C-alpha cells in the first residue's frame, strides 16, 4: 500500500538533510507505529507520506513515494488527501472556524466530496459515538479542551475512511481512556482494510496495538520489525528511546514469553466494525 524507496529530503535553504535514504513498505490493513526522539525526522516523514511535502513545504525530495501504486509527489494535493488522511499533532490546526459546530467539523470533508446528507449525518454520529463525543456535537470546537479538540480532529479524518490514515502524535492531549479508545478504533479500521501509520511516543501503545514498529533516528529509519523485536533492541538507548520503565519491562516480558493484557473498553471491536464494515472509501 505504501512504498518509500531511497527517500531523501531537505527543507528549503536547509544545510542538513531532514531525512536520508529511507526505505519502507507498509501493507494494506497494517498498523505501523513509528517512534523516535524529538527532531529525528518523524513529522517530516508523515508529511512526505501524505504529500504535504513537497506540495506545501517545498524543498528537495529525492526517491520514490507511492500509495496504492500512485506517485504521491506527482499527484495534486487534493488527490493525495483523498487517499491519505492526516491527523495533526496540534488539533487546533484542523479546526475550520468559530462559526462551526463539532458536527460541522466532522462532516466538512464528507460534504466536500458530495456524500449525501443522510449518509453524512449517520457517519458523523457513528464516529462520534465510537470516540465518545456525541455530547459535543452541537458545541463549538473553540469551547472544548485540548483533549476534546484532539478527538474531534481524529473523528474528522476517521469518518472519511481513506485507504490510508497517518496520525502524528494523536494522543498527546488525551487521558488514558481517550487514548485507548482511539487505538481501539484504529484496530477496527485495520480489520476493515485501512492502512494506519501512527507516530507516537508512548511505546507501550505501539507494542500493544501495532503489527510492526519503526524507529526514526538520526534522520533515517534505524529499525523496522515486530514490537517484540524492536523494543528489546539494546540500541534503543542510543536512539533516544530506551531507558524507560516500559522498555525495560518489555525486554523482560519478551524474554519470559509474556504477552500484553488489554483492558476492557466501552467500545468493542465488533461494535466498531459494524460502523467501518459498511463499505470502503469516502463515498461508501
Predicted regions, residues:
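The feature captures the beta-strand-to-loop junction immediately N-terminal to the Walker
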Residues: 35-37
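ABC ATPase NBD Q-loop/coupling interface
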Residues: 64-79
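Conserved ABC ATPase "signature" region
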Residues: 111, 118-136
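Conserved ABC ATPase signature
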Residues: 140-144, 148
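Catalytic Walker B motif of ABC-type/P-loop ATPase nucleotide-binding domains
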Residues: 165-168
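H-loop/switch region of ABC-family ATPase nucleotide-binding domains
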Residues: 200-201
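Conserved beta-strand-loop-alpha-helix hinge in the C-terminal portion
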Residues: 220-246
Amino acid at each position: 500500500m505504501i512504498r518509500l524507496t531511497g527517500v531523501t529530503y531537505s527543507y528549503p535553504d536547509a544545510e542538513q538533510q531532514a531525512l536520508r535514504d529511507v526505505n519502507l513498505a507498509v501493507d494494506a490493513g497494517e498498523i505501523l507505529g513509528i517512534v523516535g526522539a524529538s527532531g529525528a525526522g518523524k513529522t517530516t516523514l508523515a508529511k512526505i507520506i501524505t504529500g504535504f511535502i513537497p506540495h506545501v513545504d517545498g524543498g528537495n525530495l529525492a526517491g520514490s513515494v507511492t500509495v496504492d501504486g500512485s506517485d504521491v509527489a506527482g499527484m495534486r494535493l487534493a488527490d493525495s488527501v483523498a487517499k491519505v488522511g492526516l491527523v495533526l499533532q496540534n488539533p487546533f490546526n484542523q479546526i475550520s472556524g468559530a462559526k462551526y459546530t463539532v458536527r460541522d467539523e466532522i462532516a466538512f470533508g464528507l460534504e466536500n466530496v458530495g456524500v449525501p446528507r443522510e449518509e453524512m449525518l449517520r457517519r458523523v454520529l457513528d464516529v462520534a459515538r465510537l470516540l465518545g463525543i456525541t455530547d459535543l456535537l452541537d458545541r463549538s470546537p473553540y469551547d472544548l479542551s485540548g483533549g476534546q479538540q484532539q478527538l474531534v480532529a481524529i473523528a474528522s479524518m476517521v469518518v472519511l475512511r481513506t485507504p490510508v490514515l497517518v496520525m502524528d502524535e494523536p494522543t498527546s492531549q488525551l487521558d488514558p481512556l481517550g487514548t485507548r479508545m482511539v487505538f481501539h478504533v484504529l484496530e477496527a479500521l485495520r480489520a476493515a482494510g485501512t492502512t494506519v501509520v501512527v507516530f507516537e511516543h508512548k511505546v507501550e501503545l505501539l507494542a500493544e496495538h501495532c503489527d510492526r514498529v519503526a524507529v526514526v533516528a538520526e534522520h533515517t529509519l534505524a529499525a523496522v520489525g515486530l514490537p517484540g523485536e524492536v523494543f528489546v533492541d539494546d540500541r534503543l538507548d542510543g536512539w533516544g528511546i530506551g531507558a524507560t520503565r516500559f522498555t525495560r519491562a518489555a525486554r523482560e516480558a519478551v524474554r519470559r514469553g509474556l504477552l500484553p493484557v488489554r483492558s476492557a473498553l466501552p467500545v468493542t471491536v465488533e461494535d466498531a466494525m459494524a460502523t467501518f464494515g459498511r463499505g470502503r472509501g469516502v463515498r461508501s
